[in-house]
A protein has these predicted regions:
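Short, well-structured beta-strand
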Residues: 122, 127-196
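Stable alpha-helical elements in mature extracytoplasmic
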Residues: 36, 103-107, 111, 181-188
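Proline-anchored loop/turn motifs at beta-strand termini and strand-loop-strand connectors
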Residues: 29-50
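Soluble non-cytosolic domains of exported or imported proteins
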Residues: 31, 98-105, 175, 179, ...
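Sec-exported extracytoplasmic/periplasmic mature domains
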Residues: 41, 112, 116, 120, ...
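Sec-dependent bacterial lipoprotein signal peptides
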Residues: 1-16
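Bacterial Sec signal peptide processing site at the extreme N-terminus
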Residues: 15-31
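Conserved polar/disulfide-associated segments of primarily extracytoplasmic proteins
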Residues: 48-153
Length: 196
């Protein structure tokens, strides 16, 4: 029954979205450019304007690449958290807010909060990296999604440049989609450049 409800909800949400193929040079929020060598599908909600771009290969419940660019201090990272299923009495979804004063390792907790709206998150690795030309961190995580009990594996990159946040996350079911699609997501991430 839980799976049926999740499927029906996913179908309803899909009906409220538009999907457009993206290739070549793409600009995220006018602040960061990426080069897309293998086509992705950009997903837009008909009603909500999120502060990130969301792309997918197989459909949002199966995989997604989110890209944030130029998020100013004090802004939330999501306007409407992804919540496929909530149990009675469960806490309200969280809307993490970027603060330019946060150290890099604390920035990871913002993304942990985003994914915790969907299920149980475990951050498995955090390491220094360069993302979009700025010093930051790369992190890995798992997500036990409440809606369908699927275990997702994810990776994220986050950096702060001139008090603005630049980030990306990729997540997919760990058994087949993640190992197959991660190289495509990483190919996009390697090309990320802050504009201006």
């Amino acid at each position: 029954m839980k799976t049926l409800v999740s499927l029906l909800l996913a179908l309803l949400l899909t009906a409220c979205m538009t999907i457009a193929k993206v290739e070549g040079e793409q600009v995220v929020n006018g602040k960061m450019q990426v080069q897309v060598s293998a086509a992705w599908n950009k997903v837009n909600s008909a009603w909500d304007r999120e502060p990130y771009d969301m792309w997918t290969q197989e459909g949002v419940p199966l995989d997604h690449l989110r890209l944030w660019a130029g998020v100013p201090s004090g802004e939330t990272l999501v306007t409407k958290p992804t919540v496929w299923f909530r149990a009675p009495g469960e806490k309200d979804p969280r809307f993490p807010t970027f603060d330019a004063a946060l150290p890099a390792d604390k920035l990871v907790s913002l993304f942990e909060a985003i994914y915790a709206n969907e299920g149980v998150v475990n951050i498995t690795r955090v390491e220094p990296t360069v993302f979009a030309g700025a010093k930051g961190v790369r992190f890995e995580f798992t997500l036990a999604r409440r809606a369908d009990d699927v275990i997702l594996k994810g990776v994220g990159w986050v950096a702060v440049h001139k008090r603005e946040m630049y980030a990306a996350t990729f997540a997919a079911p760990r058994m087949s989609f993640y190992p197959r699609l991660l190289p495509m997501a990483e190919a996009v991430i390697r090309t990320a450049k802050i504009r201006g």
